């Protein structure tokens, strides 16, 4: 079946998601905005996901399927983007195979970019485990984040978030190289940073249009692989070193983000029962945190939250006490 031409292409990377995939596909099919196509990328699934994808494409011409050997979520998104660009989609959206769109997700974000004439829009998201939250009405107004405020929001506003899935992008903003960036963690943050840098601003819809499912198999709820620490630190360093020259005021924000990431990653290790596997990473993080304590661009950065400054001091000067605090009060999260 040839892929349909559409205004918006929704890209869904799929890997062993049969338990949740039908709900995800139903939510996409039920979108109030009808001029879309959906590229399902089966990334070497070994459950019923390939069959579910094929059945959906056979029954709804808006859906098309790519089957490929398992190469990871970034490679799957990249394959989907290549297909979307080949068929001439004007706008790109993403959805994870275990999550759900609000019925007005595409229509609301598309309306936002049309009204603001910006190449990028995003909305808030909510989380659910079993019962889906009540669907909120789309917002009456859209907030315009002109540069560099949109980049500052990407780094520091959890409503904007790092994810690719709560956003709508002009196809001119994204390239395959942005998505396949050699990171297994925070790959979406780095891709968003590059896309946001290429955009003059972002339309923000203060409304939970994306439903993020929390379950034991979620990537965000797994353990703490050493690569996660390395990739997150690398992403933050790349961001810090690539602030657009036209927005030099953003450098302070990027520096604060980098230092906060160091402190956060150290706390991720310290809250674990066994920190021995992370001795090397913890040592490197402590060196970076110590070096930045009295640096006006890092530990004394006015944009750095006070709680992070206290955490940085405790990491360096009261490590045993700080570990007890981390173990007792900080939730284990990715």
Model-predicted regions and their roles:
Residues 20-22, 47-56, 100, 104:
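Acidic helix N-cap motif at the loop->helix transition within catalytic regions
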Residues 34, 42-52, 70, 96:
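A conserved acidic beta->alpha catalytic loop
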Residues 115-118, 271-334:
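Membrane-interface aromatic/basic loop that binds lipid-linked glycans or pyrophosphate carriers
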Residues 16-30:
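Short, well-formed alpha-helical segments that are part of the catalytic scaffolds
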Residues 97-203, 210-227:
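Donor-binding/catalytic cores of nucleotide-activated saccharide
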Residues 208-215, 222-249, 261-293:
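Catalytic core of nucleotide-sugar-dependent glycosyltransferases
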Residues 92:
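Short aromatic/hydrophobic "clamp" motif used to bind/position activated sugar donors
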Residues 68-87:
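Glycine-rich, basic loop-to-helix element that forms the pyrophosphate-binding segment
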């Amino acid at each position: 079946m040839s892929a349909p031409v559409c205004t918006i292409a929704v890209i869904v990377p799929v890997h062993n998601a049969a338990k949740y995939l039908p709900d995800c596909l139903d939510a996409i099919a039920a979108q109030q905005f009808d001029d879309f196509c959906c590229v399902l990328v089966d990334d070497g699934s070994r459950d019923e996901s390939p069959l579910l994808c094929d059945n959906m494409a056979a029954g709804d011409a808006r859906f098309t399927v790519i089957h490929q050997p398992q190469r990871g979520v970034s490679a799957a998104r990249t394959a989907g983007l290549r297909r979307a660009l080949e068929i001439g989609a004007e706008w790109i959206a993403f959805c994870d195979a275990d999550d759900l769109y609000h019925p007005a997700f595409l229509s609301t974000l598309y309306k936002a970019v049309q009204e603001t004439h910006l190449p990028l829009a995003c909305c808030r998201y909510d989380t659910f485990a079993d019962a889906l939250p009540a669907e909120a009405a789309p917002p009456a107004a859209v907030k315009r984040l002109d540069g560099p405020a949109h980049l500052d929001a990407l780094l520091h506003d959890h409503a904007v978030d790092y994810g690719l899935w709560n956003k709508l992008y002009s196809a001119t903003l994204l390239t395959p190289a942005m998505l396949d960036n050699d990171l297994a963690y925070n790959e979406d943050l780095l891709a968003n940073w590059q896309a946001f840098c290429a955009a003059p601003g972002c339309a923000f819809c203060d409304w939970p249009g994306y439903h993020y499912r929390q379950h034991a198999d979620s990537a965000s709820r797994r353990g703490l692989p050493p690569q996660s620490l390395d990739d997150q630190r690398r992403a933050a360093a790349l961001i810090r070193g690539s602030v657009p020259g036209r927005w030099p005021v953003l450098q302070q924000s990027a520096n604060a983000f980098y230092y906060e990431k160091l402190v956060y990653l150290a706390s991720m290790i310290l809250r674990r029962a066994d920190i021995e596997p992370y001795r090397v990473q913890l040592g490197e993080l402590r060196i970076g945190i110590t070096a930045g304590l009295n640096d006006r661009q890092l530990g004394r950065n006015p944009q750095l939250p006070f709680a992070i400054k206290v955490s940085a001091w405790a990491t360096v000067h009261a490590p045993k006490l700080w570990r007890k605090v981390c173990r007792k009060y900080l939730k284990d999260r990715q």
